[in-house]
């Protein structure tokens, strides 16, 4: 049996991108939730290249008297998951909680995640109840969740919810993975011995708009499909085999019909031939696109460029910048 260590210090990691309107309330509510734990805690806010006043607000929050906030400033926008990984590299707690800055997932849920982690779970995920998102966002999320479950075999209900808790050894394992395209919830489940999901509230977004546009959702889908599994390549091979067998069967059938009914009938089968041709061409383009995605990711990983660059770190215990 593995020994269950009680949680002594909690680190809350929050990526921030153009969230100046929600930051004061985010800091207040997150601090209050952490204070109620009766444990040591720190709140790491990672500015992901914001173009508004978010970075300055984070610095001020870190330098306030009695602050528990660590501000990490990235030199440009790298994306949500890269920003979270930057936060992971600076945590000091033995339980790490991730949270979005838009307050749609209430910080008041943090004590529930800590309590569940204290039961011995490596990863505590969450499922949003009564989602307050648009029809498009909810539909896209359902499709992505089903796609992930089928391609990875990991049966989790809501991969899109970033309100999650990870034991320190899970975070350390993820930090040893150097691929640039990373989807943290799936990566964490690969290393987790015990994982669980709990239902959480989901509120409407009070400030600003979602940072995930249609194209960013498409990019996220490609990341999910190609960065953690080779299942699409296997499916492509299976699909190619089915199409090839089907095309060969149709060709044989056309030859038999021509021999049976004469060349006059064959002229009327031109459209069928075109349909078969277009099917093959379409399948080739799909295959080339997927292979291109994998080759592109191999090229990116071979270059071994860092997934993020930390420009500045401000800790509350010292007014000096790292």
Curated annotation (Swiss-Prot):
Q: What class of enzyme is it?
A: transferase
GN (gene name): arnC
| Listed transmembrane segments | 236-256, 270-290
UniProt protein name: Undecaprenyl-phosphate 4-deoxy-4-formamido-L-arabinose transferase
| Record keywords | Antibiotic resistance, Cell inner membrane, Cell membrane, Glycosyltransferase, Lipid A biosynthesis, Lipid biosynthesis, Lipid metabolism, Lipopolysaccharide biosynthesis, Membrane, Transferase, Transmembrane, Transmembrane helix
The record lists the catalysed reaction(s) as: UDP-4-deoxy-4-formamido-beta-L-arabinose + di-trans,octa-cis-undecaprenyl phosphate = 4-deoxy-4-formamido-alpha-L-arabinopyranosyl di-trans,octa-cis-undecaprenyl phosphate + UDP
Q: What is the scientific name of the source organism? A: Escherichia coli O7:K1 (strain IAI39 / ExPEC)
| Major site of localization recorded for this protein | membrane
Q: In which pathway does it act?
A: Glycolipid biosynthesis; 4-amino-4-deoxy-alpha-L-arabinose undecaprenyl phosphate biosynthesis; 4-amino-4-deoxy-alpha-L-arabinose undecaprenyl phosphate from UDP-4-deoxy-4-formamido-beta-L-arabinose and undecaprenyl phosphate: step 1/2; Bacterial outer membrane biogenesis; lipopolysaccharide biosynthesis
NCBIfam families given in the database record: PRK10714.1
| HAMAP family linked to this entry | ArnC_transfer
């Amino acid at each position: 049996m593995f020994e269950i260590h009680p949680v002594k210090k909690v680190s809350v990691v929050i990526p921030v991108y153009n969230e100046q309107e929600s930051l004061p309330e985010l800091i207040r509510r997150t601090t209050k939730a952490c204070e109620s734990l009766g444990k040591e805690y720190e709140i790491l806010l990672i500015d992901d290249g914001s173009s508004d006043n978010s970075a300055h607000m984070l610095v001020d929050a870190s330098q306030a008297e009695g602050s528990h906030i660590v501000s990490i400033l990235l030199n440009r926008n790298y994306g949500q998951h890269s920003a979270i990984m930057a936060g992971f590299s600076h945590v000091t707690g033995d339980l790490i909680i991730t949270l979005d800055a838009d307050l749609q997932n209430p910080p008041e849920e943090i004590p529930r995640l800590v309590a569940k982690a204290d039961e011995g779970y490596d990863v505590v995920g969450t499922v949003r109840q009564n989602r307050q998102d648009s029809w498009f966002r909810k539909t896209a999320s359902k499709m992505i969740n089903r796609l992930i479950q089928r391609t990875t075999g990991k049966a989790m209900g809501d991969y899109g919810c970033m309100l999650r808790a990870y034991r320190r050894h899970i975070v350390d394992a993820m930090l040893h993975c150097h691929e640039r395209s990373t989807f943290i919830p799936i990566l964490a489940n690969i290393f987790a011995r015990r994982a669980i999901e709990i239902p959480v509230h989901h509120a409407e977004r009070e400030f600003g708009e979602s940072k995930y546009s249609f194209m960013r959702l498409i990019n996220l889908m490609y990341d999910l499909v190609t960065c953690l599994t080779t299942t699409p390549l296997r499916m492509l091979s299976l699909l190619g085999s089915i199409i090839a067998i089907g095309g060969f069967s149709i060709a044989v059938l056309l030859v038999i019909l021509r021999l049976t009914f004469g060349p006059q009938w064959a002229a009327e089968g031109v459209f069928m031939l075109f349909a078969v041709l277009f099917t093959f061409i379409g399948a080739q383009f799909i295959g080339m696109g997927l292979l291109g995605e994998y080759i592109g990711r191999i090229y990116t990983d071979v270059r071994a460029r860092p997934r993020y660059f930390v420009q500045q770190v401000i800790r509350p215990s010292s007014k000096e910048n790292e």
